[in-house]
């Protein structure tokens, strides 16, 4: 079983590390090509392209400039411990033990605009380059054209290595669009998280993101390997709703608190 999640805009390079183990990202040659493109942008261009403030644009122009292909624990941090958005609040990787990191390294992948695919312990230098950004590059007009089949091929390698054909898609639409489902050698399962609001169940972005992290942690902690095991997920009040679920879309609901 391979779990896919999105990266986060918020990064943490300060907190104590939960592990000193690390690996190197596998697609750095491609990342370097994107960095070369990004370095051609001025801070005002970055601001317009990403829709961010001048201050953030300056920070990211500096990050692109400072980025170097030789990753060490001094200039980089394990991806699963560097990302700090809502998904990662649910995941709480900072509390993983060695066995959790082992399982996650084999079964969890983070999709990334700059790095393509990251394993949890892959070192990562700080960046901001969302998958949906229209950064022109030698391969096309955006990052989807840049990555092409590369991300899908890397996921197929991971599936082959673990010997099964199940992908649990906990990534956002923006990021999963970088994967080619028809070329993926796997059964695709998408958990959906609905929260009750004024008597109706709907996707509430903040809660849904955190729930994706909670589900990822549930799979990792319990060493789940079969799709049917996912329906036992019951963290923070969620329950499986068989009536509205299908074989490839598992619906989890939570009543208003």
From Swiss-Prot:
InterPro entries: YaaA. Signal peptide: none annotated. One of its GO terms (biological process) is response to hydroperoxide. One of its GO terms (cellular component) is cytosol. Belongs to the UPF0246 family. HAMAP family: UPF0246. This is UPF0246 protein YaaA. It comes from Salmonella agona (strain SL483).
């Amino acid at each position: 079983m391979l779990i896919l999640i999105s990266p986060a805009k918020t990064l943490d390079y300060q907190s104590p590390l939960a592990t000193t183990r690390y690996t190197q990202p596998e697609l750095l040659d491609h990342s370097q090509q994107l960095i070369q493109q990004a370095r051609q942008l001025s801070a005002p261009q970055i601001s317009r392209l990403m829709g961010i403030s001048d201050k953030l644009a300056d920070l990211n122009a500096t990050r692109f400039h400072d980025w170097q292909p030789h990753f060490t624990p001094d200039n980089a941090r394990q991806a699963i411990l560097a990302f700090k958005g809502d998904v990662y609040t649910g995941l709480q990787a900072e509390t993983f033990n060695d066995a959790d990191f082992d399982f996650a390294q084999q079964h969890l992948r983070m999709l990334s605009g700059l790095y393509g695919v990251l394993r949890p312990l892959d070192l990562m230098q700080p960046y901001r380059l969302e998958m949906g950004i229209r950064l022109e590059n030698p391969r096309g007009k955006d990052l989807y054209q840049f990555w092409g089949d590369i991300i899908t091929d890397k996921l197929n390698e991971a599936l082959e290595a673990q010997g099964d054909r199940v992908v649990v898609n906990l990534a956002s639409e923006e990021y999963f669009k970088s994967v080619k489902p028809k070329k993926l050698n796997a059964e695709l399962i998408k958990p959906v998280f609905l929260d009750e609001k004024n008597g109706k169940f709907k996707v509430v972005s903040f809660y849904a993101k955190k729930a994706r992290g909670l589900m990822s942690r549930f799979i990792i902690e319990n060493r789940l390997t079969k799709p049917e095991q996912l329906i036992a997920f019951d963290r923070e009040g969620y329950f499986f709703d068989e009536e509205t679920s299908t074989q490839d879309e598992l619906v989890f609901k939570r009543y208003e608190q």
